[in-house]
Regions:
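Charged, structured surface patches that assemble and position nucleic-acid processing machinery
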Residues: 110-111
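A short, conserved, highly charged catalytic patch centered on acidic carboxylates
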Residues: 1-106, 117
Length: 117
């Protein structure tokens, strides 16, 4: 299956299941991990996808980004996830804080329906 077909299938799945997805963690498992997989990454390989990667921010130690896509041991894409019903406008600053202390070149804020790069 090519990328376009994978995304179409994921879109259909999201709209079919979303009312049954009650938590952020369930959103990550049902919607966002399949999206990462559709991008061609193995979500179960910690050399490619690191869940809950620590992004210490000045005085806030222990802050974690939901997923970091890795290349050669360095993050290239940070993904911050929210519950599918969350307004992403309320969380822009969180991803920006993580992005500013990382070597990653790209950041993604998503609720599994909307994907903001």
């Amino acid at each position: 299956m090519d990328f376009k077909d994978s995304i179409k299938q994921l879109s259909e799945r999201v709209f079919k299941l979303k009312e049954n997805i009650l938590t952020e963690e369930a959103t990550k498992n049902a919607f966002i991990m399949p999206f990462i997989n559709a991008l061609g990454y193995d979500v179960f390989n910690p050399l490619e996808v690191v869940p809950e990667m620590t992004c210490d921010i000045a005085m806030k130690k222990g802050e974690k980004i939901d997923y970091a896509i890795m290349k050669d041991g360095e993050p290239v894409l940070l993904i911050e996830c929210k519950h599918w019903a969350q307004d992403l406008n309320l969380h822009d600053n969180q991803l920006i804080r993580y992005f500013n202390v990382s070597k990653a070149k790209f950041g993604l804020l998503t609720n599994g329906i909307i994907y903001r790069f």
